[in-house]
Amino acid sequence: DVRELGADFLAFSAHKALGRMGIGVLWGRHELLDAMPPMLTGGEMIDSVTEQDATWASVPEKFEAGTQDAAGIYATGAALTYLTRTVGYDAVAARESALVPYLMGRMAELDFIDVIGPADASAHHGVVSFNVRGVHPHDVASILDASGVCIRAGHHCAQPLLTWLGVENL
């Protein structure tokens, strides 16, 4: 319950839960959303408009510019249903808890791989960031992709963190 958490906002990216890229959810306290101007403009978000002024629709409509991605919304619901009812979060956590130590152990055997973060596998929570010395991360991703292994490479929308870590890409 986000109200119990005391959160002002909660953002969710569907692709991080088996959903499609480019769709997500934003929950926010009504009074904060009401005070915010929309970032984008489009149909269905205007209550009234003149040549000089526009009055935004009420929350949430004032943030929903243009045509909604109906297929993406449906796909997100299906992905979440599959993840929660068929697979289950506990099963995902158990699988990650088994795979991460295995992966980190195998990587530790290779002197050309630098794992970013703590040596304790349980601190990685299902994500292992690494670099292969002398090879650009996008090349590593392409090579692994050819073997059926899917990873993400790049700056992961976290360039300040990468600068702090002393790396350009992962």
Please provide the spans of the model-predicted regions.
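Pyridoxal 5′-phosphate
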Residues: 1-170
